[in-house]
């Protein structure tokens, strides 16, 4: 078994290395040709930022076409677009050549029923090279198809798009769940690129893609230079990616690797699955998982994809038997049965049929949110265009517990040896929610500290799964002890034979950032955490330590460099700081 596992790993590494080398060759060729093509491209039609425009994106004066006016309504958790008219233009794609126009519309544009396209084309409302088409029209290479439609866009979340970083070339954002990256299918103005264009007043171009339901870090280019710089790094695998997921059940402690290939089963219902490399359209894939915490029902899991296949993380988690708990595709018991597709299936025909009904006759469901309201057909049509009308999306449509948390360059600064760049978002609320009760417990512990003129008051809680192992607060034990120190001592006194001080998978909650230096010469709390030999794998803090404690506290970098997850839970900063300064002169001003 070990030999076969090693062979599979070697096969994956060989395939990945070939992919990386190919991407690097493309990057070098692009760089070499950039100056050569500068004069050649000067005659190309471009937008204000220098991006080339396709012919169908321009008007007769070779300037960028403007979008039609549209009205946005914020309705509680939903961002809605009022129906509007839009003229859709596209040139014949290679796969459309020598096919009937009506057949192409039916197979490619699935947001309408076949009868709608037949009727629309028969009435002469679709044009081919500016001439009305009919049901017998055949599409040829170079043909321009024009179709004016009355569009009904599905609502998306009304959560704002937060900007993480911006310079003259790139924009880094925290993408909310439920919003497509760019215009596609039924979506145009309820997309990231169009929303940002409306918000910023200029166009941006995606450097990486996130699925519609996935939230988190996205890179968008403001200039062609930014697009090349970031896009080439992504393709050449010069970037590490870290996602956060909330999955069903108690995920194992330790590192879990999955290197099963992935394939598309049915793009119409967005179904993908694990497979063998011998299967048609199989693509090598590998994801590394590590548990962050377990709350008795679900686990927070750190996910590091080494490849970027569609639904890779979701499919690999399902394969392990720990699907994302609110995943409407891969965690729906009515579709997959009690095992939820663990280990993969031999045949997916029944799954495809059931998924095809989602959003039509049945709303989306998931393991954590069964029988919830969601989008489905209302059974009535628009009076203007006869399009089928839908209900508003629900919980399973608007949020997926999968978040792109951190992207980091693999290249290092030659002087500091730190990554050339590193971006992260705030931790998503759905990943923090199970931990708030323990942080509130730590705050109560901090409140037990007596007032002092110079020392600081902190509370700490050690948790394993749902079991509270020990609590502590500053100076609870003799010797100018810190809260984390007290909790660890109290647990070790009750369990003197534990080889790692606390059980593997223990989580520490502390109201203040653990200290990395003790003026008293006592062992810093950061070092005490590392002394557990990985048993404490995650630290949640209420507030980062201010410089008035110890300047340049390096706990965050030190713990993360040793593989410890370090996460702040927002909402407790003021309370934790007020308690910390209890008894100090002018404590209110310091807080």
Curated annotation (Swiss-Prot):
The active site is at residues 211, 484. It catalyses: uridine(32) in tRNA = pseudouridine(32) in tRNA; 2,5-diamino-6-hydroxy-4-(5-phosphoribosylamino)-pyrimidine + H2O + H(+) = 5-amino-6-(5-phospho-D-ribosylamino)uracil + NH4(+). Binds 1 zinc ion. Pathway: Cofactor biosynthesis; riboflavin biosynthesis; 5-amino-6-(D-ribitylamino)uracil from GTP: step 2/4. Residues 99-168 form the S4 RNA-binding domain. PROSITE patterns: CYT_DCMP_DEAMINASES_2 (PS51747), PSI_RLU (PS01129), S4 (PS50889). Residues 1-432 are annotated as: tRNA pseudouridine synthase. Present with 1540 molecules/cell in log phase SD medium. This is Bifunctional protein RIB2. It comes from Saccharomyces cerevisiae (strain ATCC 204508 / S288c). The lineage of its organism: Eukaryota, Fungi, Dikarya, Ascomycota, Saccharomycotina.
């Amino acid at each position: 078994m070990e030999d076969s596992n090693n062979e599979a790993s070697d096969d994956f590494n060989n395939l990945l290395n070939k992919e990386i080398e190919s991407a690097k060759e493309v990057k070098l060729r692009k760089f070499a040709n950039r100056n050569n093509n500068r004069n050649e491209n000067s005659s190309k039609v471009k937008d204000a930022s220098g991006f080339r425009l396709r012919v169908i994106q321009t008007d007769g004066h070779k300037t960028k076409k403007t979008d039609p006016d549209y009205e946005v309504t914020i309705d509680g958790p939903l961002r809605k677009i009022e129906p509007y008219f839009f003229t859709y233009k596209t040139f014949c794609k290679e796969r459309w050549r020598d096919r009937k126009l009506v057949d192409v519309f039916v197979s490619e544009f699935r947001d309408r029923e076949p009868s709608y396209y037949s009727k629309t084309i028969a009435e002469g409302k679709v044009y081919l090279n500016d001439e009305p088409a009919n049901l017998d029209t055949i599409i040829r290479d170079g043909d321009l198809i024009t179709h004016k439609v009355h569009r009904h866009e599905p609502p998306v979340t009304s959560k704002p798009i937060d900007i993480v970083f911006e310079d003259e070339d790139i924009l880094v954002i925290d993408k909310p769940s439920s919003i497509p990256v760019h215009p596609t299918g039924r979506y145009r103005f309820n997309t990231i690129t169009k929303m940002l264009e409306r918000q910023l007043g200029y166009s941006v171009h995606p450097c990486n893609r996130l699925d519609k339901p996935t939230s988190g870090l996205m890179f968008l280019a403001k200039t062609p230079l930014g697009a090349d710089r970031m896009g080439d790094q992504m393709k050449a695998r010069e970037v590490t990616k870290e996602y956060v997921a909330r999955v069903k059940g108690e995920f194992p402690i330790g590192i879990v690797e999955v290197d099963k290939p992935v394939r598309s089963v049915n793009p119409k219902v967005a179904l993908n699955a694990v497979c063998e490399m011998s299967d048609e359209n199989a693509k090598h894939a590998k994801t590394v998982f590590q548990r962050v915490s377990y709350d008795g029902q679900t686990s927070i899991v750190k996910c590091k994809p080494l490849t970027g296949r569609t639904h890779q993380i979701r499919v690999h988690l399902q394969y392990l038997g720990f699907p994302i708990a609110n995943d409407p595709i891969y965690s729906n018991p009515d579709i997959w049965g009690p095992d939820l597709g663990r280990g993969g299936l031999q045949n997916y025909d029944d799954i495809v049929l059931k998924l095809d009904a989602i959003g039509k006759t049945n709303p989306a469901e998931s393991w954590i949110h069964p029988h919830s309201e969601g989008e489905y057909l209302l059974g009535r049509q628009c009076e203007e265009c006869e399009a089928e009308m839908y209900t508003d999306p629900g919980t399973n449509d608007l949020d997926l517990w999968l978040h792109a948390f951190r992207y980091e360059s693999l290249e290092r600064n030659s002087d500091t040896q730190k990554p050339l760049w590193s971006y992260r978002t705030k931790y998503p609320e759905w990943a923090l929610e199970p931990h708030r009760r323990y942080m509130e417990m730590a705050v109560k512990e901090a409140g037990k500290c007596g007032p002092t003129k110079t020392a600081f008051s902190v509370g700490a809680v050690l948790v394993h799964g749902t079991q509270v192992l020990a609590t502590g607060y500053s100076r609870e034990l003799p010797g100018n002890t810190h809260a984390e120190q007290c909790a660890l001592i109290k647990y070790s006194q009750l369990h003197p034979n534990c080889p790692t001080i606390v059980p593997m998978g223990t989580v520490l909650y502390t109201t203040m950032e653990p200290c990395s230096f003790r003026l008293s010469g006592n062992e810093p709390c950061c070092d005490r955490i590392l002394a557990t030999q990985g048993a404490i794998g995650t630290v949640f803090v209420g507030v980062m330590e201010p410089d008035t404690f110890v300047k340049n506290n390096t706990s965050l970098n030190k713990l993360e460099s040793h593989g410890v997850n370090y996460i702040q839970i927002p909402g407790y900063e003021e309370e934790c700081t007020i308690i910390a300064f209890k008894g100090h002169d002018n404590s209110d001003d310091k807080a």
